[in-house]
């Protein structure tokens, strides 16, 4: 069976790796470089790791695994009748097609948005790194995973960092946990502007409802927009993302979708960890070993500055501190969620316990 994967990000790469010993695999990606670690981009920008450390696998690795890798090649259309992906360089036939096209950065619809940088690719990271090294400072707009991680790492590296967030709380967490994150980042040197709405940008800074904030380098991290254009052009059903069922099947026969481009019952993965787990589950399905992915369960770990935090399961409602660094959330006497600071071993143990609730 010939499996074609469009996209070489965390989900697409992991799927290719999982299937390469079983099927003939081709990966198509519009970027000109092999797989790199997107979660480590902010660490590279801050100067904590060199650029080459972002690339764990060489092109030779793909060849040794028997994976055909077609880089700098954009998929333009899917001919579902002939089962062919049409690219700018030719046609690629498939038996099974997997769309792992990821997402792009959401841009605010404001005057002066051309003065804002975004972070999704290694080339975005290169531009940001060069800009901040020249200026020594950055304004970050957005208090999600990317914004907080970048702010913490840049501040830890000695840059002057201002973070603008339209709300007062972060990552869907409660006020107590949000304040802890804020306090820890403030100790690192991040200056916060909360409940601040971005209105306009120019070369000298940004205008918010709280006033004008000066800064030459402005990085916007206010969310993602799933890349659905290929699917939509090809007549595959889309909403915010490419619509899939609980086996990752799209509305087109023998076409699947995973990662940030895929939408299941209103849910979009949003993290590299989720995309990679979806890839592992889909690989088993395609090998004839059916397995279920729990779309409602979230688990992510990220690091900004000296702070490492794991967010697991449902963290809504009233939680209880069981240790200084661990807050858990219960339902009917069972743990349904947890937030763990600076202890990945404990987070892994709790994740297994919480997964039992969801299974």
Curated annotation (Swiss-Prot):
Descriptive protein name: NAD(P)H:rubredoxin oxidoreductase
Gene3D superfamilies given in the database record: 3.30.390.30, FAD/NAD(P)-binding domain (3.50.50.60)
Organism taxonomic ancestry: Archaea, Methanobacteriati, Methanobacteriota, Thermococci, Thermococcales
Record's catalysed reaction(s): 2 reduced [rubredoxin] + NADP(+) + H(+) = 2 oxidized [rubredoxin] + NADPH; 2 reduced [rubredoxin] + NAD(+) + H(+) = 2 oxidized [rubredoxin] + NADH
Homology family: Belongs to the FAD-dependent oxidoreductase family.
GO-annotated cellular components: cytoplasm
Superkingdom, taxonomy of origin: Archaea
Activity versus pH, per record: Optimum pH is 7.0 for the reduction of rubredoxin.
Cofactor notes: Binds 1 FAD per subunit.
UniProt KW keywords: Cytoplasm, Electron transport, FAD, Flavoprotein, NAD, NADP, Nucleotide-binding, Oxidoreductase, Stress response, Transport
UniProt subcellular location: Cytoplasm
InterPro entries: FAD-bd_OxRdtase, FAD/NAD-bd_sf, FAD/NAD-binding_dom, FAD/NAD-linked_Rdtase_dimer_sf, NROR-like_C
Binding site for FAD: 11, 29-30, 38-39, 75, 103, 120, 260
Protein task: Catalyzes the NADH-dependent reduction of rubredoxin (Rd), a small iron-containing redox protein. Can also reduce other electron carriers, including 2,6-dichlorophenol indophenol, benzyl viologen and menadione, but rubredoxin is the most efficient electron acceptor. Does not reduce ferredoxin. Shows comparable activity with NADPH and NADH as electron donors, but NADPH is probably the preferred physiological electron donor. Is probably part of an oxygen detoxification system that protects P.furiosus during exposure to oxygen.
Record text on subunit structure and interactions: Monomer.
Temperature dependence: Thermostable.
Co-factor(s): FAD
Entry EC number(s): 1.18.1.4
Miscellaneous comment: NROR, unlike the vast majority of enzymes from hyperthermophilic sources, shows considerable activity at low temperatures.
Gene Ontology molecular function terms on file: nucleotide binding; oxidoreductase activity
Coiled-coil features, chain-numbered ranges: none
